Amino acid sequence: MFISEIQLKNYRNYEKLELSFEDKVNVIIGENAQGKTNLMEAIYVLAMAKSHRTSNDRELIRWDEDFGQIKGKLQKRNSSLSLELNISKKGKKAKLNQLEQQKLSQYIGVMNVVMFAPEDLNLVKGSPQVRRRFLDMELGQIAPVYLYELSQYQKVLTQRNHLLKKMQGNSKNEETMLDVFTLQLIEHGAKILQKRFEFLHLLQEWAAPIHRGISRGLEELEIVYKPSVDVSESMDLSKIKEVYYESFQSVKQREIFRGTTLLGPHRDDLQFFVNSKNVQVFGSQGQQRTTALSLKLAEIELIYSEVKEYPILLLDDVLSELDDYRQSHLLNTIQGKVQTFVTTTSVDGIEHETLKEAKTIHVTNGTVDCEIDRE
């Protein structure tokens, strides 16, 4: 799949923009704070209906405006689709071929993207929240039902935490309501956990050989899920629910005392092992970056295996963060099969066949000039 054009209105520092793209490589060049990352983000938001940079949608709307809009034309193997996302203070509305989608979960997954930005290099050594977000965003693209369960879980979690805060003063009158929220949380949480196990099993299958290739056969990568309760991938849904129920019963008084939910998918984490050593603790910066690169390349192949089309790859100021070897490995892997967007302050020092026939887009303070290089 590839995006052939995009239109922005009141998006970040873009008042109005119409731009067409090549189906292979597009290089976006500009100094810092000119709008190249905003353009990259707009493509991501069009696909995912949320930003990878902020959870506050108001930040996506141009200063002093009430709404922002992103439109795009997506070319898939057997169809051409128009996508539209309207952002206002009231929320977001998505359209597919001019038809408004009742739920964002019906819209997300139509256009698949993989974002690789400098912050993704922190996937290994960053906070557990970074790794959970990675799981949620990637899994949501190939399993819309996961996004539904996640949104329901988050609603119940907010209500349950509010009740636990209230119960810190007087717990006796609210225990029945707490039990209701606990059962609802278990219902959604168990399904989230099961989907994460399934996804990570697939990710492991793709990431391990990719990592082996990048490390020239010297390293074996293993991805381990660390749940907040004693469950395993082999358990069925009913067993996971049973373990959750018993675990919540055992921490009930502690949760009331603390005023917050102590168990569940929102407390889980991922660990990465290279040659049986925890990369987060014992890995070199090079191993951590190889692990992050392996995961991103694995995402591309995993999405292809699930939807039978390659996703769009967004490389936001990340090539300069990789050494020549990892840079070449990345570009060799995607060459000719994945529509790729690259942002950079300069192409100097990036010598690769993939960039030779790229469309070059120069961004200066929210305006663009385009050219196609044919060297």
From Swiss-Prot:
The keyword Cytoplasm applies. Keywords: ATP-binding, Cytoplasm, DNA damage, DNA repair, DNA replication, DNA-binding, Nucleotide-binding, SOS response. The keyword DNA damage applies. One of its GO terms (molecular function) is ATP binding. It is found in: Cytoplasm. It holds the Pfam family SMC_N. PANTHER family: DNA REPLICATION AND REPAIR PROTEIN RECF (PTHR32182:SF0). This is DNA replication and repair protein RecF. It comes from Bacillus cereus (strain ZK / E33L).
